[in-house]
Amino acid sequence: MAGIQQQQLVNDTLPASWNGSSNRIASVNVEEGQPQPWVDDLDLEDPNHQKPGWRKFLSYVGPGFLVSLAYLDPGNLETDLQAGANHRYELLWVILIGLIFALIIQSLAANLGVSTGKTFKHHTSWILGKHLSELCKAEYPKYVKYCLWLLAEIAVIAADIPEGIISSLLYYFKLILDTYLLIGTAFALNILFHIPVWVGVLCTGCSTLLLLGLQKYGVRKLELLIAVLVFVMAACFFGEMSYVKPSATDVLKGMFIPKLSGQGATGDAIALLGALIMPHNLFLHSALVLSRKMPNSVRGINDACRYFLIESGFALFIAFLINLAVISVSGTVCSAQNLSSENADRCGDLTLNSASFLLQNVLGKSSSKIYAIALLASGQSSTITGTYAGQYIMQGFLELKMRKWIRNLVTRCIAIAPSLVVSIIGGSSGAGRLIIIASVLQMILSFELPFALIPLLKFSSSTTKMGPHKNSIYIIVISWILGLGIIGVNIYYLSTGFVGWLIDNNLPKVGNVFIGIIVFPLMAIYILAVIYLTFRKDSVVTFLGPNKNDPQQQANMENGLGPEMERVPYREDLADIPLPE
C-alpha cells in the first residue's frame, strides 16, 4: 500500500512535459509531518523577508573553502614542487586550466546537492536533499555500484604493492590520500620542533580529532578555522615568493602559453591535473552544501547556486595563487645559475622534507620555518576535509549506521597505521619514500575521475534529478567537452605509457605477452565502463515538481516566478559530526 501511495505521489507531481505518466522509478526520502508555512500565504512585502545581499551570501560561505583544501594538500604541494623543479614555469597553464575546470565541475556538484530531492507546494510530506554518492547508490544497479567500489580498492592496492604497507585497508577515494596528508604534517612538526617523524604522525592523528571536535559547537566555527588555515598558507607561500622574486614575464608565459617540452612533461602535467581534480572532492562538495538551510523555491535555489559559485570561485582563486607561488618558488630556486651541486641533487629528487632544506640553504633559516608553518596548515586542514569526504562516501554508498564519532576514530587510526609503521622503521627517509609513492597515486586518481565525473555530469543535466535547475545547454556542452577531454587524455596516456613500457622493459618476451594478455583486456573494460556510464539512461526520479493539475504552479516553477518559501528541513546528519559527551 505504501508503494502505491508513493507512486501516486510521483504521478501527481510529474511535470507536464512528461504527458502525465512515466515508467521511471521515483527515489524519495519522505519524512512525514506537518508542512512548514509557506511565504506565499503571507504578505510578500513583509519587511522581515530576507532579500539577496551580503548577509544572505555570508550564510552560504564555508563549503568552498573546505573543498579548496583538496587543491592545497601536501601531496598536491609536492607535485607542484616537482613540476617547478623539473620544468620551471612551463606547467603553470595546467594549473590555470585545471582550476577553471575545477570551478565548473565543483559548481555542478554544489548545484546537484542544492537542487536534488526537492518538493513543491501542496505536498503533505518533505523530501530531503541527496548528495552524489547517495544518488549513485539509488541510480545504478548493484553490480555497477560494487564495481565502482572495487575500482577504488584497486587504486588502494596499487599503493600497497610497492612498499608492502597496509594502506589497502583504507577505504575509498578519501582514505588513499591520508598517507601523505599525515606525513606532510609530521614533516612540518619535524622541521619546526625537531621531533621524530613518528611522533609527528601520532600528534597529527590526535590533533585532527580535536579539531573535528570544534564542529560539536557549530559547523561555522570549523569552517572559520579552515578559512584561517587557507589564508595562513597563502601568506606563507607568498612570503617565500618574495624571497626568490621570480620573473613576472616568465610566470605569465607559463600561465598562458601551453607547452609540454622536456622529458616527463606529459606525465607531470597529468599528475598535476590528477592532483587538482580529485574524485572524492565531487562527493564532498555535493554533501557539504546540504548542511545549509535554504528555501525550496526556484528563486531561492537559484540564489543559493549563485552564492555557492561565487564563494567557490573566490576559494579556488586563492588556491590557484598558492599553487602558482609554490611552482614559482621551486622553479626559480632550482634553475638559479649559482645553485650548488648538492642543492641541484635535491632539486632532482625533490620531496616535502628535502624542499625545506633546499629553501634553508638557498634562502635562509627563516624561509624554511615559513615553509614548515604552511605545510603544517596544509596537512591539518587536509586531514579534516579528507575525514569529511570519507564519511559522506561511506554513508552514501554503504549506508553505514555506525555512530559518527566511532567511524571518525576508526578511520583516523587506520589512516595513521601505514605512516606510523614506515616512519618508525625508516625515519624521515622512509616517510619520504612513502610520500613519493603517494604522489604516484595522483595519476591513479586521475584515471578514476571518470567514475565520479560522468555520474555528476549526467545527474546535473537531468530533468529527473534537477528539474528546472538542470544545466543550460551551454554548460552541458562545456562541461562534457572538458570531461571527455580529460578522460581522453587519461586513456591516451594510459595506453601509450603501457605500450612504451612493454617495448623498453627488460622482461623476457613470454613475460611481456603474459602481461599484455592481462592488461589490454582491463584497458578495454575501462573504456567500456566509461562508455556505459556515459550513455546509460537515468531511471530514478529525485525531483518532484508542483501538481500537474495546477497550471499556475507549473508556470511558477518553470519560469522562476514562485514566491520564497519557508526554510525546509535540512540534512542534520551532514551538518554535524557529534563526538561523545
Swiss-Prot record:
InterPro entries: NRAMP_fam. GO terms for biological process: iron ion transmembrane transport; manganese ion transport. The keyword Transport applies. Its main location: membrane. Keywords: Glycoprotein, Ion transport, Membrane, Transmembrane, Transmembrane helix, Transport. Glycans are attached at residues 11, 19, 338. Residues 564-574 have a biased composition (Basic and acidic residues). It holds the Pfam family Nramp. The chain crosses the membrane at residues 57-77, 90-110, 146-166, 181-201, 224-244, 270-290, 307-327, 370-390, 409-429, 434-454, 473-493, 513-533. Residues 551-581 are annotated as: Disordered. GO terms for molecular function: cadmium ion transmembrane transporter activity; manganese ion transmembrane transporter activity. It is a multi-pass membrane protein. It is found in: Membrane. HAMAP family: NRAMP. Belongs to the NRAMP (TC 2.A.55) family. This is Metal transporter Nramp7.1. It comes from Populus trichocarpa.
